[in-house]
Structure formats: C-alpha cells, structure tokens
Amino acid sequence: MLNSAMSVVILAAGKGTRMYSDIPKVLHTLAGKPMVQHVIDAATKLGAAQVHLVYGHGGELLKQTLKDDKLNWVLQAEQLGTGHAMQQAAPFFSDDEDILMLYGDVPLISVETLQRLRDAKPQGGIGLLTVKLDDPSGYGHITRENGKVTGIVEHKDATDEQRQIQEINTGILIANGADLKRWLSKLTNNNAQGEYYITDIIALAYQEGREIAAVHPARISETDGVNNRLQLSRLERIYQAEQAEKLLLSGVMLRDPARFDLRGTLHCGMDVEIDANVIIEGYVTLGHRVKIGAGCIIKNSVIGDDCEISPYSVVEDAHLEAACTIGPFARLRPGAELLAGAHVGNFVEMKKARLGKGSKAGHLTYLGDAEIGDNVNIGAGTITCNYDGANKFKTVIGDDVFVGSDTQLVAPVTVGKGATIAAGTTVTRNVADNELVLSRVPQVHKQGWQRPVKKK
C-alpha cells in the first residue's frame, strides 16, 4: 500500500537510574554505537521526514555525542510519563502525516518490523506493536472485545483478571498527526503513577470507533528495552549472534561465532576465515580469501585479497593491497598503507607510513611518517625518528634498500635506491643511490679484563 508521509518521535528523556552511571541511558553503547543511534538509524532507513528526539537528563551530552543537525530536539523538562513526552513533541506534528513513536532504549527494533507496522495502520486508526509473553508481569496488558483491541491497562492499574492477559504493549505505535494531537490533549494522570500514559489513546481511539491494528515483531528481542547493564549485555549477545548468523549464511567462516564481535559494517569477499575473539569496528572490507587470526582488532580498514593477519594484531584506518601478511602482534595505526605482497611482522608498528611492494619489516620496528619503496628489507629494531619534541618529519626510503638491524633514521632524511645501511647505524643525512652507510663506535678489545666484584 502507499504510505503517508511519516515523522518519528524517539523518547530519550529517562535518566536510567538503574544503570548507575553519569552517562544518559540511551548513550550506553550496543555494538559500539549508542543505543539511541540504532533507533535513529532505523527511523532514517524507514524514510522518516523528520526525527523528533525528546530529551531530558543529560541533554548537552546527548547533543555533543549525536551531533546530528537533522534531529529536532524536544525538551521534556519534567518526566511525567510517555503521554507527557509526546505532548511536548505534538506542536511539531503535521496534520496530514503519520507519527511513529519509538524508544531510545529499545535498540534492536528492525526496519522490517516497523515497515509492517506502518503498512498495517488502518485509515484514521492506530498501528500498535504487541507481543505475547509467558510472564506478562509489569507490562501494559492489551484488552480486546470480540477480537478487537479496545485498550491497554498498565499492570499497576489492572485487575487480577487483566493481569493474566499475555498480550502486552511494547509502546511502539503509529497514528495520524491530527488524530494523535487530539487524543494527546485529552490525556489525564488519574492513575496509580500519577503520570500521563500514551497508552490511554488506544481507549480514546476505540471510543471514537477507530480501528486499532496489532502487529507482532519478527523477534520478541526487537522490543526488549534496557533498564540496567545486565539487560544491555544480553541484548549485545543477541545482536552479535544475529550478525554472526548472517555472516555465516553469506559464506564467511567464523571459527567460533559466540566469540566474534561486529561493531560496525563488514563487507567480505569469498572464502574469508575469521578466528575466535576478533573484533570488527567501523567500516571494514575484507577481500577474497582473507584470513584473520585470533584476537585481532580491525577498524575502518580495507584488507585486500589473500591477505593474512596473524593473531593479536591491531589494524586501524589502514589499507592493505593483495597478499600482504601481518603479525602476530603487529599494530597498523591510521594512515598505514601496504602495497601488494608487503610483510609486517611481530611487534612492528606503522603510522602514516607506506610500505612498498614486496617490502618487509619483520621484527621490533617503528615506521612513522615514512614512505618506503618496493623490495626493501627493514631490519629488526629499526626506528624512524620522526618527532623532535615539537614537529613530525618524514623519512623516505627508495626501492631495493637494505636496512640493517638496530638502525635509526633521524627525519627528515632520504635514502636512495639500492643503498645499504649497516647494522647499528644512525642515519642523520641523506644517502645517495647504491651507497653503503655505517656509523659505529670503534670496537675496543681489552685483554685480561676483570669484571667488577660486588663489595661484601
């Protein structure tokens, strides 16, 4: 069916006392992203013309964290219930648009479920998302007559008979803007909590003869809210299990799906293998036949075909061409670039550095602010000294250079093609093509040398 224009209201004013945190509840993260951002993203994908965010506690921190100029920020100075929160947003509703109500602490709601709810909304009526629970205690119970939804009774206000009703309200609903404003204006706080319940609009709509269509989510976990860290941790595991399942079904080999975390977006080629305890953050692309060892962290990086990253390596904001090998225990920091066939071994760190085709840095090395050519050997213990205490400087190493172990290159410095730098050398001046450079303290031999003896 053809949907009306739609705006979304996200309720995010709660303090989250049971989180025991100075951070507003909706800013606590799931899969590396604030809970409320998951909800905002769902609203955006659904095609919301406007997203109204109702905030209260921690408003400044919310604005600093989300930094979204497309949000309409609506202050709820006093937390007097969900109906009161919607009343604060009501002046922004257009009469001819639909209004979808979501919650900033219900992060797993899916676009697919929301689209079904949107499609099911009757003309002039309400679309209501409900679930059935074995134990409905503490929730708002759905009342029906002859199968039709007639209202919602909060648990504290319900009779013993009503408390046995297993179908409960999730709080997510959609209605026309003009209708919603009219119903909101009629809400009262005559209940056990002394609050304005948004759920009371269901009875108001029924009294007007409007139809209420109840829709169930694909998974109950989509409507699970978060009130404490235990609940958040459970949703994290549900979310990660779902992501792992999608990857496995798309052909990615996760050696232990229960020990894999995706905290962003992952694009994979064919025959990718990922070992246990790997964390993917941000936007990551893995080419064909990539292998990621146990305990690695990959963030905002592109990994080319046939690359292998050995265990406990960290790759952040880096770009690897085909057939590169990394680690174990390597660290690629932002700006690291490896051309085809390059190798970075154990305890090697790169930052804003380019390692050419077939070049190798095998052990215990720091390469920062450096441009390194093709077929270069970087010996163990090599350091590019890029910082003078105030500014950073660049090291340039040409093709086919051999850098011996324990070499320091004091930037700015350039080493020409084919040059050889002897072990233990400190390079402070430019080196011409094909030169041999060495700087060592003369070796001294003392015959009959006696070691010092400790005093008794």
From Swiss-Prot:
Its cofactor is Mg(2+). Mg(2+) binds at residues 105, 227. Residues 230-250 are annotated as: Linker. This is Bifunctional protein GlmU. It holds the Pfam family NTP_transf_3. GO terms for molecular function: glucosamine-1-phosphate N-acetyltransferase activity; magnesium ion binding; UDP-N-acetylglucosamine diphosphorylase activity. Keywords: Acyltransferase, Cell shape, Cell wall biogenesis/degradation, Cytoplasm, Magnesium, Metal-binding, Multifunctional enzyme, Nucleotidyltransferase, Peptidoglycan synthesis, Repeat, Transferase. Catalyzes the last two sequential reactions in the de novo biosynthetic pathway for UDP-N-acetylglucosamine (UDP-GlcNAc). The C-terminal domain catalyzes the transfer of acetyl group from acetyl coenzyme A to glucosamine-1-phosphate (GlcN-1-P) to produce N-acetylglucosamine-1-phosphate (GlcNAc-1-P), which is converted into UDP-GlcNAc by the transfer of uridine 5-monophosphate (from uridine 5-triphosphate), a reaction catalyzed by the N-terminal domain. PROSITE patterns: HEXAPEP_TRANSFERASES. The keyword Cell wall biogenesis/degradation applies. SUPFAM superfamilies: Nucleotide-diphospho-sugar transferases (SSF53448), Trimeric LpxA-like enzymes (SSF51161). Homotrimer. Residues 1-229 are annotated as: Pyrophosphorylase. It is an enzyme of class 2 (transferase). Disulfide bonds: none annotated. It comes from Salmonella agona (strain SL483). UDP-N-acetyl-alpha-D-glucosamine binds at residues 11-14, 25, 76, 81-82, 103-105, 140, 154, 169, 227, 333, 351, 366, 377. One of its GO terms (cellular component) is cytoplasm. It comes from the Bacteria. Coiled coil: none annotated. In the N-terminal section; belongs to the N-acetylglucosamine-1-phosphate uridyltransferase family.
